[in-house]
């Protein structure tokens, strides 16, 4: 549990773990052929993802699960002619707001029925985890249709009182914009938009909130 949310960095230096904002280096420096082999192995484990996406675009972002271990969010990219990756461990079990010290006032946002709720902060500050807690609170207490649009999917929600439809950009839909526009025709009560990424997506999200839906999303801030 202590490693959940921590990150492992693979590039042309020793394997580096980022835990509680501290960098811990392990082993000898990796050569470019070592990083390529490790990243190729990650794509083999992920199965549904192909390394050709990385080679074509120069970067890729996806998640996958290993039974009895956990889910992993992976960002692969090319830098200085070699391959690199950042891997984050995500627990199968959804986080407990009390264990994460999320204030009760924040959790009360799950009681809203319409409007736009933004969770802001820097990378790694817990935006996605906070949203997962809010979505799970609604899932456990209300009969709603919840649609999540994420890139990639992180926490997986099981149907409880609500029905939860989870869509991943690139594997389930072309883009946030396309998925968000389509979601308005899918009878949603609650929409989770992983990130306010561009003007048109923001505009559609605001329209959804103004027309009676409850929309959750994130913004990167310093």
How would you label these PLM feature ranges?
Residues 7, 74, 109, 151, ...:
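Residue-level signature of catalytic and energy-coupling elements of molecular machines
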Residues 123:
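The conserved Walker
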Residues 14-21, 25-28:
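Amphipathic coiled-coil signal-relay and dimerization helices
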Residues 143-145, 152-222:
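Switch/coupling sub-region of P-loop NTPases
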Residues 24-30, 35-36, 40-118, 136-150, ...:
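P-loop NTP-binding catalytic core
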Residues 130, 134:
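Hydrophobic positions on the alpha1 helix immediately C-terminal to the Walker A/P-loop
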Residues 2-10:
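Short, small-residue-biased leader/transition segments that mark boundaries at the very start
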Residues 126:
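Conserved glycine(s) of the Walker
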